[in-house]
Amino acid sequence: MKTIMFYEMAPDGLSKAMAHVDEHKARLKTFYERGVLLMAGPFANPAEGALGIFISKEAAEEFIRDDPFVTNGVVGNWRLVEWNEVLV
């Protein structure tokens, strides 16, 4: 089942993001190329966070576990929501 990952920025997350953005983007690219990340990106106002859509909860959890934005405090909170896609 597809899973949506929601990231919320830490209070000081934007100030930390630039130091880790290249590693974070490389991780996104790797998961996309593996076919387990369908799309991802920040909201129009990056301070509001970001989302990613994964093919499974396990893939999302694997991504989060070692994401530089999570391990370095850019992301303050995250949550996963399993999603029943209707239109394909």
Predicted segments — roles?
Residues M1-V88:
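Conserved, structured core segments of small domains
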